[in-house]
């Protein structure tokens, strides 16, 4: 039985530790000590060959610099997002510390609460090293169907961008604009993130599969989604600071929105949904912003 170390004991990290424990000997660690089975120190985790890292995107760079020493690990990254300060995708950040052929990225539609209930789930493991993807795929339980892909760019763009669309969808729901408007917003969001993905060499098929459309439809249509709930808060007139405090969890879409806004300005890209979400996070009246977008 393979030993796997999970770094990050939030909802998603804990859910993955639960799922992987069916076939693996799993250990877990986090910044804050937890009263959990198989909770160990980071030093013990880093002695293992297989690592699953579920650290939020905005914390990854500092954590890698301060705590991570590569020791021939095989790494599966289980977070999605773009670093707001640098505009870097997670693969760009991790590849500064881990060889490309030793790292994979997890994507696809997955709520942690449903994984914890062993409900059917499908995920994609993305890596340039197909043998590595196959290794990690073998660790997942029967209720999680895994697929593999080499399109890291597609998985990274889709996984990050869908959180921004989910914020917009939450605003749409909170304003009571109806299901017609929501369907229009989500489908246009899919086109927007696919167009953005081409800038990074992403493949079109990734956006119509689990990593793209699948994850987008899940995240942008349910109050189980943190980013959707951010949108609901904006529709209620709350500031992003108030929303984050009430949420008590990381909503990756906020940092990703700011990153996309900066990238769009730098590269002169037309990203209307990301732009409007940025304006609304900055305090623009959502009644004005979203209605104007939907009518144009």
Curated annotation (Swiss-Prot):
Q: Which organism is it from?
A: Sulfurimonas denitrificans (strain ATCC 33889 / DSM 1251) (Thiomicrospira denitrificans (strain ATCC 33889 / DSM 1251))
Q: Which PANTHER family match?
A: GLYCEROL-3-PHOSPHATE DEHYDROGENASE, GLYCEROL-3-PHOSPHATE DEHYDROGENASE [NAD(+)] 2, CHLOROPLASTIC
Positions that bind sn-glycerol 3-phosphate: 80, 108, 110, 162, 215, 225-227
- Does this entry carry the keyword Oxidoreductase? yes
Which reaction equation describes what this protein catalyses?
sn-glycerol 3-phosphate + NAD(+) = dihydroxyacetone phosphate + NADH + H(+); sn-glycerol 3-phosphate + NADP(+) = dihydroxyacetone phosphate + NADPH + H(+)
Q: Which UniProt keywords apply?
A: Cytoplasm, Lipid biosynthesis, Lipid metabolism, NAD, NADP, Nucleotide-binding, Oxidoreductase, Phospholipid biosynthesis, Phospholipid metabolism
Q: Know the name of this protein?
A: Glycerol-3-phosphate dehydrogenase [NAD(P)+]
Q: Give the record's pathway.
A: Membrane lipid metabolism; glycerophospholipid metabolism
Gene symbol of the encoding locus: gpsA
According to the record, the signal peptide region is none
The protein's matches in Pfam families, at most eight in alphabetical order, are given as:
NAD_Gly3P_dh_C, NAD_Gly3P_dh_N
Task: Report the function annotation for this chain.
Answer: Catalyzes the reduction of the glycolytic intermediate dihydroxyacetone phosphate (DHAP) to sn-glycerol 3-phosphate (G3P), the key precursor for phospholipid synthesis.
Q: Where is it located? A: Cytoplasm
Q: Which SUPFAM superfamilies match?
A: 6-phosphogluconate dehydrogenase C-terminal domain-like (SSF48179), NAD(P)-binding Rossmann-fold domains (SSF51735)
- Name the Enzyme Commission number(s) assigned to this protein: 1.1.1.94
**Keyword NADP among record annotations:** yes
Write out the residues that bind NADPH.
Answer: 12, 31, 80, 112, 226, 250, 252
The active-site annotation reads: 162
Q: Which family does it belong to?
A: Belongs to the NAD-dependent glycerol-3-phosphate dehydrogenase family.
One Gene Ontology term of the biological-process aspect is:
glycerophospholipid metabolic process
Top-level taxon in the UniProt lineage: Bacteria
A GO molecular-function term, please? NAD binding
Q: Which GO terms describe its cellular component?
A: cytosol
HAMAP family with a match to the protein in the record? NAD_Glyc3P_dehydrog
């Amino acid at each position: 039985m393979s030993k796997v170390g999970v770094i990050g004991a939030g909802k998603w990290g804990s859910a993955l530790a639960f799922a992987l424990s069916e076939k693996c000997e799993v250990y877990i660690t986090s910044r804050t000590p937890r009263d959990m089975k198989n909770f160990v120190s980071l030093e013990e985790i880093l002695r293992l060959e297989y690592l699953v890292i579920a650290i939020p995107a905005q914390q990854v760079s500092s954590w890698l610099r301060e705590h991570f020493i590569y020791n021939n690990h095989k790494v599966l990254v289980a977070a999605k997002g773009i670093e707001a300060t640098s505009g870097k995708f997670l693969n760009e950040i991790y590849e500064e510390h881990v060889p490309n052929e030793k790292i994979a990225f997890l994507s696809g539609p997955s709520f942690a609460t449903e994984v914890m209930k062993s409900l059917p789930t499908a995920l994609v493991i993305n890596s340039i090293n197909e043998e590595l993807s196959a290794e990690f795929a073998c660790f997942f339980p029967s209720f999680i169907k895994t697929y593999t892909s080499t399109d890291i760019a597609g998985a990274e763009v889709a996984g990050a961008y869908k959180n921004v669309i989910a914020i917009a969808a939450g605003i749409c729901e909170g304003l009571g604009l109806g299901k017609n408007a929501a369907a229009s917003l989500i489908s246009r969001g899919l086109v927007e993130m696919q167009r953005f993905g081409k800038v990074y060499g992403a493949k079109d098929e990734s956006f119509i599969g689990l990593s793209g459309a699948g994850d987008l439809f899940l995240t942008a249509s349910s109050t189980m989604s943190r980013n959707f709930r951010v949108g609901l808060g904006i529709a209620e007139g709350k500031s992003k600071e108030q929303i984050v405090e009430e949420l008590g969890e990381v909503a990756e879409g906020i940092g990703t929105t700011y990153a996309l806004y900066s990238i769009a300005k730098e590269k002169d890209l037309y990203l209307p949904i990301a732009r409007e979400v940025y304006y609304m996070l900055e305090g623009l009246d959502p009644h004005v912003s979203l209605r104007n977008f939907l009518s144009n």
